[in-house]
């Protein structure tokens, strides 16, 4: 039995209607089989750069920048023997014949996607088992395949694992995970938010609506883990996922179409008009000047509408510039204008606006330490919004025409190549909708 009466219409990445009157809870991470599968597979999937390992060993460059050790170079045809290495890795990691261990060679054997069996995750406290098991299995496979002696074994280890265990972030290594190391988490429950914007953009191959969906799915699923989407607040996060992340009722696409030649301010006008027309907000009082103050008839839905408008405003503004740099100021001033226009709180009740202030400073302005694409929901600057600030940044980076120093191609090439090989990661919108249709009559 469903807890909420909300029904939504679902649309594909091109804005074509796929389903109508779907229960809101069909997209919940607690019910949707695709989202459940995505979370599980993100935890057990590791990207391996076989070409990088071969190059590191050939040049003696192990452990990252500035770590070239003359005389330690080893010539191995890792790419040429990729199939044998992959088979050996699978045989080491497999718990039982026919289990869900998966090893997939990509790009002619230059990269490898490895999924550890679920049983290894089941007996682990957290997801580090995937990276560590894969790294150790790959090390043994290389040592066995190429008859590496005891004196060069540590060099092979470093070519794979980088500076681990001295650095728990695998600095200079040739394996990667979407989630990163647990030691980097800003707080409890932040693991699914520890995915850089550029990783999401690269994984979805810069598909705008899919990148937004991918980011929103993980950000809002993290809210369930963090205890935010519990009790009275669950519906708020489900509606946010639906309207901002999954383009429910085609709201985002319609806003963008209506403001194709518009501005951030015109998007604000459109979302306010839409909220009034749908009865989401109503006039509270009219001032002597004729200015209307509004109140929400449904505060959670108002937040969801505002969040959808935020993504649309970023698409209009950053899309016009073909550049992502103004995404922070767009998030900030969309909310600022929206609050002045209605007298109501902006997206996430002020948290997204507050996030944008710090985000503006640290993504350019006086400091300018990194572009928008390197931030994530676990970052000390952008962690404060409860799942609503990172999806718009993903939208901006999808539309960037190469203006960024920290581009997805530069920061996320390995992750993008490997994770995009899995359909549900590359096209999450399509498969989450399929999952919703699968369970909608079972709720």
UniProtKB/Swiss-Prot annotation:
GO CC terms of this entry: cytoplasm
Principal location class: cytoplasm
Annotated positions binding coenzyme B: 369
Molecular-function annotations in GO: coenzyme-B sulfoethylthiotransferase activity
Alphabetical UniProt keywords: Cytoplasm, Methanogenesis, Transferase
GO BP, sorted A to Z: methanogenesis
Pathway membership: One-carbon metabolism; methyl-coenzyme M reduction; methane from methyl-coenzyme M: step 1/1
SS bond partners: none
Enzyme class: transferase
Catalysed transformations (reactions): coenzyme B + methyl-coenzyme M = methane + coenzyme M-coenzyme B heterodisulfide
Requisite cofactors: coenzyme F430
Enzyme Commission code: 2.8.4.1
Subcellular location: Cytoplasm
Cofactor: record remark: Binds 2 coenzyme F430 non-covalently per MCR complex. Coenzyme F430 is a yellow nickel porphinoid. Methyl-coenzyme-M reductase is activated when the enzyme-bound coenzyme F430 is reduced to the Ni(I) oxidation state.
Binding site for coenzyme M: 367
SUBUNIT field: MCR is a hexamer of two alpha, two beta, and two gamma chains, forming a dimer of heterotrimers.
Family from the record: Belongs to the methyl-coenzyme M reductase beta subunit family.
Biological role: Component of the methyl-coenzyme M reductase (MCR) I that catalyzes the reductive cleavage of methyl-coenzyme M (CoM-S-CH3 or 2-(methylthio)ethanesulfonate) using coenzyme B (CoB or 7-mercaptoheptanoylthreonine phosphate) as reductant which results in the production of methane and the mixed heterodisulfide of CoB and CoM (CoM-S-S-CoB). This is the final step in methanogenesis.
Name listed for the protein in its UniProt record: Methyl-coenzyme M reductase subunit beta
Native organism taxonomy: Archaea, Methanobacteriati, Methanobacteriota, Methanomada group, Methanococci
